[in-house]
C-alpha cells in the first residue's frame, strides 16, 4: 500500500495517515467488513470524565445533521435523548465509556465521529466505518523499533499525544439514512437504546464497540492481500500473527507467504500470551460430527462442522443415529424445502437427516425433517468453500443441525450409496469435541479469520467465525453479543493488551 505521508512529522517518530479503515457493510450474508477512506475536521464533543482512559467523542457534523439532527425522538432503552442527534451521541458515548473504563492511558483518546449519508439501497447498506487515523513508528518509549502502532496506542505508550495537532486518533462515520428511508434498508435501522433490546434493529453500541476496537489497534496495517508492509516496516500485529503450518510469525515471512496464510482456512493463529492464557476461560468446546458404523468405510472419522443459530446447541450428550439422505430432486439431491414424501419420511424417522443446501432457508429444511421424525440434520454445502454456520431463527426447531463442506458432504453421500429404506449402516453422532476449543488451533491458540476466498477488510483483522461463544471481533455482528469486551465473555481486550494496551 502506498503511504499517504512517509515524512517524519515529529522528532521522535514517523507518521503515516493510512487509508485502510474498517467499514461495516450489511450484505445478504450478514454484516461484513470492507475497506474505507475517512477524514474530517475537528469540533467540540463530549468526554468520559471518570474512565481509566478518557475518550472524547469529537462531533464532526454540521448544525442540523448527524449528531445535531433535531428530529424529535422518544427516549428508548435507557437512552434519555429527546432528539435523534442526541440519542446517537449518547450511544457513541456509552461505547466510549465501556472502552474508557477498560483501557488505561494518560493521553485522552479522541474519536472524530459523524453521521452522514453512505451507500445503501433497499436490500443492503454500508453501516459505517472506523479505524486509526494515523500510525506511528519509532516514537519515544516504543516497545519495538521500526514497527507501526495506531495513533491512540502510540500516544499511550509515549505518555504524550503523538497525533498531528488538530487530528483525532480514531475516525468514525456512520450511515445517517440507515432504516429511515425506503431506499436505505428500510425497517433495519440502528437501535439507539443502551440495553441491547434491539429486536429487529442493529444494536449501535455493539457495532461501535467493534469499530472502536479497530481504531484502538485490532487490525494489521500490513496489506493482507499482497503481504506488503508499509515502508517495509511491520505492524505490531505482525509479531503475533502465526502461520501455524510453517510455525512462523508474519514478521518472519515473505510478502508472498503472508498473502498465502491470509487465505488458508484455519491457518493463521494469534500467538499473543495474554489472549492464549484467556482462551480456556472464554471459549467452549468445538462442535463435532463423528461418523462410524459398518458401512462408513472411508467416510468414517471426525468432521468439522458449522453450528446453527436455531435449535438446541450440541452438547456433551451426543445425538446419535443412522445417517439417512433426503432425496427429493431428479438429480439425486435432497433440498427438504417442502414436507417430505412418505419414502423420505420413512428414511429419516428416528435418524439423522442429510440434506443439501439450496433453494430455501435452513430453518425450513430443519422444520420439514423434524416434522418427519428426524432427530438431527446435517446440511451438505452446494458450493466449494470453508465450513460455515447455519443462519435463521425458528423457536419451534427442537433438533440439532450442523453444516459440512461440499467436499465432506460428497464423502458422506458416497458412503450412503448402499442402504435400505430405513438403515444405512453409517452412524452420525452430533456432539462436542472436548479436547478442542471452538475456534482454536491444535495448540489452543485462537484462529484469525482467513477464508480461502479473500474478503477485503474482513480477512485477517478479525477473529475466526468458528469461535464459541461468538466474539465481538468476528467479521459479523451476531445477535448474541453482549456489551462486554473482557473475559470471561470476550477476547477483544486481551488482544489489545498483547499489543501494548
Kindly give the residue locations of the regions a language model identified:
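N-terminal secretory signal peptides that target proteins for export/translocation
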Residues: 1-24
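Sec/Tat signal peptide C-region and signal peptidase I cleavage site
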Residues: 44-51
Amino acid at each position: 500500500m502506498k503511504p499517504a505521508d512517509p515524512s517524519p512529522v515529529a522528532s521522535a517518530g514517523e507518521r503515516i495517515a493510512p487509508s485502510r479503515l474498517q467499514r461495516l457493510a450489511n450484505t445478504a450474508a450478514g454484516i461484513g467488513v470492507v475497506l474505507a477512506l475517512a477524514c474530517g475536521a475537528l469540533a467540540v464533543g463530549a468526554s468520559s470524565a471518570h474512565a481509566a482512559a478518557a475518550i472524547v467523542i469529537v462531533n464532526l457534523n454540521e448544525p442540523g445533521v448527524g449528531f445535531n439532527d433535531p428530529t424529535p425522538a422518544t427516549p428508548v432503552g435507557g437512552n434519555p435523548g429527546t432528539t435523534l442527534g442526541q440519542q446517537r451521541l449518547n450511544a457513541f458515548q456509552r461505547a466510549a465509556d465501556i472502552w474508557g473504563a477498560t483501557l488505561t492511558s494518560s493521553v485522552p483518546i479522541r474519536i472524530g465521529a459523524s453521521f452522514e449519508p453512505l451507500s445503501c439501497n433497499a436490500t443492503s447498506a454500508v453501516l459505517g466505518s472506523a479505524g486509526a487515523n494515523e500510525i506511528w513508528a519509532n516514537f519515544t518509549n516504543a516497545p519495538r523499533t521500526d514497527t507501526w502502532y495506531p495513533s491512540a496506542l502510540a500516544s499511550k505508550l509515549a505518555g504524550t499525544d503523538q497525533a498531528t495537532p488538530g487530528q483525532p486518533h480514531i475516525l468514525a462515520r456512520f450511515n445517517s439514512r440507515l432504516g429511515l428511508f425506503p431506499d436505505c434498508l428500510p425497517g433495519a435501522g440502528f437501535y439507539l437504546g443502551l440495553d441491547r433490546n434491539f429486536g429487529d434493529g442493529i444494536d449501535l453500541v455493539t457495532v461501535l464497540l467493534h469499530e472502536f476496537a479497530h481504531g484502538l489497534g485490532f487490525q494489521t496495517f500490513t496489506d493482507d492481500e499482497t503481504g506488503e508492509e508499509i515502508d517495509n516496516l511491520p505492524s505490531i500485529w505482525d509479531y503475533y500473527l502465526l502461520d501455524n503450518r510453517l510455525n512462523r510469525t508474519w514478521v518472519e515471512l515473505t510478502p508472498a507467504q503472508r498473502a498465502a496464510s491470509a487465505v488458508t482456512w484455519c491457518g493463521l493463529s494469534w500467538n499473543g500470551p495474554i489472549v492464549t492464557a484467556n482462551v480456556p476461560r472464554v471459549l467452549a468446546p468445538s462442535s463435532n460430527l463423528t461418523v462410524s458404523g459398518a458401512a462408513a468405510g472411508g467416510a468414517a472419522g471426525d468432521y468439522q462442522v458449522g453450528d446453527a443459530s436455531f435449535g438446541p446447541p450440541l452438547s456433551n450428550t451426543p445425538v446419535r443415529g443412522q445417517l439417512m439422505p433426503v432425496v427429493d430432486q431428479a438429480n439425486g439431491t435432497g433440498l427438504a424445502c417442502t414436507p417430505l414424501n412418505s419414502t423420505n419420511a420413512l428414511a429419516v424417522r428416528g435418524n439423522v437427516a442429510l440434506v443439501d443446501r439450496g433453494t430455501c432457508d435452513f430453518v425450513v429444511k430443519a422444520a420439514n425433517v423434524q416434522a418427519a421424525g428426524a432427530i438431527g440434520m446435517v446440511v451438505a454445502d452446494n458450493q466449494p468453500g470453508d465450513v460455515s454456520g447455519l443462519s435463521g431463527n425458528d423457536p419451534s426447531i427442537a433438533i440439532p443441525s450442523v453444516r459440512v463442506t461440499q467436499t465432506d458432504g460428497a464423502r458422506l453421500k458416497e458412503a450412503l450409496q448402499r442402504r435400505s429404506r430405513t438403515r444405512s449402516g453409517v452412524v452420525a453422532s452430533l456432539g462436542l469435541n472436548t479436547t478442542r476449543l471452538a475456534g482454536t488451533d491444535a495448540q489452543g491458540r485462537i484462529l484469525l479469520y482467513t477464508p480461502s476466498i479473500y474478503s477485503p477488510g474482513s480477512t485477517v483483522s478479525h477473529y475466526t467465525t468458528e469461535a464459541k461463544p461468538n466474539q465481538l471481533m468476528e467479521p459479523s455482528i451476531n445477535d448474541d453479543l453482549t456489551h462486554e469486551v473482557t473475559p470471561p465473555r470476550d477476547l477483544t481486550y486481551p488482544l489489545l493488551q498483547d499489543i501494548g494496551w
